[in-house]
Amino acid sequence: MKSRSLQSKLFLAYISLACLILFSFAVFFYAFVSRQLKDSQISAMNTLNSSFQTQVDSAIRNLDAVSVNINYSNQSKTILDKSFNLSISSDMLSDMSDLFISLSGTELKADQVNLYDFSGYVLEAGISTIVKKTDGSKDEWIEAARELEGKKVLTPPYCTREYTKSATYDQWFISLYRSFNNQYKRSVGVIETAKQCKSVFKSIITYKKKNHEDAASVYVFDSNGDLIYPYDISQEYKAALQPYFELTKGDDSALTLASPLSGRTEYAAEAVSSYTGYTYLTIQPESVVLAPVYNLLRILAAIVALFLTVSIFISYRLSRSVVKPVKHLKHIIQRMELDSLGQEKVTAYPVSV
């Protein structure tokens, strides 16, 4: 019974050692590989943010450039009256639309250019080319541009059918407003340059289409913290995504956060444009980032189970091989007499040399 107890102890010791080694390796493997995957994913998301920011900034700079060029063009100043004021009429349409198109360039830096006077008229050129009375829907932005005296005013994405011929579907635009000044730097009107959102956010849209379900979530917030991409979603969904902006307030460009939508752990990378003030937030769930680790762990678990089975067999054989000589020696000692120690005695118990 005692020999069995000794064998059991040895067997458990061997098995415990094997399990400790295998478990330590599994923990190290998980910690090391998951860390590498996390760092790699965050680096990739930072690269994505940089490319998104570069493309969007370029689109906004193009709108800005067209606006500035119109403001400083000598040809645009010829439409002013003798008092150097702007009074839009249909006679200006042909010349000014040609000017706007030429300043926009062959790349169509702006899809639509509008020039407003302070009498309630607008000259439109681009997708829509017309002179008409304004409807007052843009008075807020016109007034904001007047107050900033030449500085740009960026609108959030807005939906309109104003420039669609059939008026049966919506288009999303971003506009840049700037005051239009005469030769004496006095504001006499407002310039609006507009671009469709699908062009402004082209790089993000292309990335999402190419990667489908594997694509990271991309959110863009303006300097006020309002969500501007994705733009064509419901107000309820926008409100649900708003907490993401609060979670990004900090010094780190790489974050680990809990999703406001699902509560799951997510990895995020952010970038802020000094030109537009936009914050780009790219997010990937931890379960997606660590999916390769989980797959490898399943393979590792099968290998560990195999090694453990082999270890059990080897441990059993080793424990028996150690206990057998001890048991043998025990029987020899039991057959020896204390007073005959040192004398050779013949026994029936076979002794191997």
Q: Predicted regions span which residues?
A:
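Extreme N-terminal signal-anchor transmembrane helix of membrane signaling/transducer proteins, especially
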Residues: 1-43
